[in-house]
Design a protein with these regions (language model features):
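Acidic, contiguous N-terminal accessory segments
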Residues: 1-92, 100, 104-121
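Feature activates predominantly on carbohydrate-active enzymes
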Residues: 71-72, 78-235
């Protein structure tokens, strides 16, 4: 089979057309409590088991890091016939390695998951990778936004700035007010989905149409940030 494409393209890739398979699955070793979201992806791709014949899947922290490998999201993935080694800078690095494993995995004629032998070293070139939803056109639905966040995770993006101009609680006339119950629940859903995909959900405020440059409105802005904090938002 041809080598699969990896998106986005990693910094360094050396892959063989030879493939490894683990008919008895993999057993975890190394890090005691790897990231739950990353492990969910890994379990979707590989069979994780306590079988004594399973091959090792070892997760460790990167050592002797270059400056690039100290960046959030950096990882080193080594696949040999006997094991898989993943060395990571942080939980985001493990999540990105898991996304790469999903793209590399194929199924053979016997139903076994196979992976190409090789080494992948990857790290981000830029600290903030993502989008601003701030346009004035047709608004995205809540489902659209959830799907966008999942796409960002797959593409190893880490920033989503929420600022749709059809949202009157982000902009005028209601930016000073709390979100109603339904919309507040949707914000919570977006924050949760963003976190599961290692995306920073950034809530933007757009008060320019009617803000008064007074101490009162300064406090209104801070109070609104407090309301959003209570909904789970941590970036503004």
């Amino acid at each position: 089979n041809p080598l699969p494409a990896i998106h986005p393209q990693p910094q360094e890739v050396t892959l063989s057309t030879n493939r490894m398979k683990a008919p008895h699955g993999f057993t975890l070793s190394g890090m005691q409590h790897p990231d739950d979201d990353a492990m969910r992806l890994i379990r979707q791709t590989l069979s994780i088991t306590d079988n004594s014949e399973a091959l090792p899947l070892k997760i460790t922290s990167l050592e002797d890091r270059t400056p690039e490998l100290k960046r959030s999201g950096a990882y080193l993935l080594v696949i040999t016939p006997e094991e898989i080694d993943i060395a990571i800078s942080d939980s985001r690095g493990l999540f990105y390695a898991a996304q790469t494993l999903q793209q590399l995995a194929q199924t053979d004629g016997q139903g076994n998951t196979t992976l190409p032998l090789g080494v992948i070293k990857d790290y981000p070139d830029v600290a903030y990778r993502g989008t601003v939803e701030g346009f004035y056109g047709d608004p995205w639905s809540h489902t659209d936004r959830i799907e966008q966040l999942r796409f960002y995770g797959k593409m190893k993006m880490n920033t989503y700035i929420y600022g749709p101009k059809d949202d009157p609680y982000h902009s005028s006339p209601n930016w000073r007010k709390p979100y109603p119950e339904k919309e507040a629940a949707q914000i919570k859903d977006l924050v949760k989905e963003a976190a599961a995909n290692k995306v920073d959900f950034v809530w933007a405020i757009h008060p320019g149409l009617d803000i008064k440059w007074t101490d009162e409105d300064r406090m209104n802005v801070l109070n609104k940030f407090g309301m959003m904090y209570d909904l789970g938002v941590r970036s503004f």
